[in-house]
């Protein structure tokens, strides 16, 4: 049994009987942190829990995906997409990498939803109050004005109540927002499957400030490939690099992120910044033998 599966089963064991019985067939060895709208409705009917109660009850399962070797502080988040599907997320840390590269649970859940094709988030449930960094990150979303935040033992509040007089994309003249469907039409002639996958990600990236359209693809020792696209933020620092989004993709797919063996990064050369150096250093900390292909378009 993997460490993740052990954590999931420990979380299951602490749930009310009716919910545990209904969840057990879902939380199997293939579970990748997504609960469909229909599954959620079925769980709610079987458990007789309210929408809020059920989301809060599921948080320990989301936190089971946490990778926290530095803090040993496990945070879970559940983002509900506009489709009604629920996406788990958890904080991620890396040994020997500066702390600015860590991923917060809210960022993880939202990135997970983005990877799965969601175009907005209606609510997010978290087991600890969102830090200022995450409040600003969420303010970039297409649905920032209507996004609701649920904490344990608290009434649901809007993001704007957590971030009064907020600064966001509209203050910089940007319409849309993070998770808006995009296709930038970047092109690259290459025989490399990893570069092609990274190009697909770059074409979905959100980079209206630096214009560094960028994406990455990671190949793991298992042979599976995971991708990530850049999620830029109006406040700059809360931006989430493409590598971090790809690591969320891998982690929520039950991969050990230390088993990345090769990667490919694609960037638009017209961008004001580059992710190349920090991507190289972070990948080398995960696996010193990793290979990295790079294309600046």
UniProtKB/Swiss-Prot annotation:
GO terms for molecular function: cytidine deaminase activity; identical protein binding; zinc ion binding. Substrate binds at residues 91-93. Its EC number is 3.5.4.5. One of its GO terms (biological process) is cytidine deamination. GO terms for cellular component: cytosol. PROSITE patterns: CYT_DCMP_DEAMINASES_1, CYT_DCMP_DEAMINASES_2. Its cofactor is Zn(2+). The keyword Hydrolase applies. The active site is at residue 106. It catalyses: cytidine + H2O + H(+) = uridine + NH4(+); 2'-deoxycytidine + H2O + H(+) = 2'-deoxyuridine + NH4(+). Keywords: Hydrolase, Metal-binding, Zinc. This enzyme scavenges exogenous and endogenous cytidine and 2'-deoxycytidine for UMP synthesis. This is Cytidine deaminase. It comes from Aliivibrio fischeri (strain ATCC 700601 / ES114) (Vibrio fischeri).
């Amino acid at each position: 049994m993997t460490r993740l599966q052990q954590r999931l089963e420990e979380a299951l064991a602490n749930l009310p009987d009716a919910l545990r019985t209904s969840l057990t067939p879902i939380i199997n060895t293939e579970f990748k942190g997504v609960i469909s709208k229909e599954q959620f409705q079925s769980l709610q009917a079987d458990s007789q829990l309210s929408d809020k109660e059920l989301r809060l009850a599921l948080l320990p399962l989301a936190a089971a995906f946490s990778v926290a070797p530095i803090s040993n502080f496990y945070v879970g988040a559940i983002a509900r997409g506009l489709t009604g599907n629920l996406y788990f997320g958890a904080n991620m840390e890396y040994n020997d990498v500066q702390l600015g590269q860590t991923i917060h649970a809210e960022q993880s859940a939202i990135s997970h939803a983005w990877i799965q094709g969601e175009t907005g988030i209606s609510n997010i449930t978290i087991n600890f109050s969102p830090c200022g960094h995450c409040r600003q990150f969420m303010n970039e979303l297409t649905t920032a004005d209507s996004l609701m935040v649920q904490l344990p033992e608290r009434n649901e509040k809007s993001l704007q109540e957590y971030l009064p007089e907020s600064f966001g994309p509209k203050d910089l003249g940007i319409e849309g927002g993070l998770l808006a469907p995009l296709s930038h039409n970047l092109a690259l002639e290459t025989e490399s499957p990893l570069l092609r996958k990274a190009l697909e990600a770059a074409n979905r990236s959100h980079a209206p400030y630096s214009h560094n359209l960028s994406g990455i693809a990671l190949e793991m020792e298992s042979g599976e490939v995971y991708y990530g696209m850049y999620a830029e933020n109006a406040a700059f620092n809360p931006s989430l690099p493409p590598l971090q989004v790809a690591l969320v993709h891998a982690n929520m797919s039950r991969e050990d992120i230390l088993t990345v063996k090769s990667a490919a990064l694609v960037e638009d050369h017209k961008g004001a910044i580059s992710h190349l150096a920090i991507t190289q250093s972070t990948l080398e900390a995960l696996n010193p033998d990793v290979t990295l292909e790079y294309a600046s378009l």
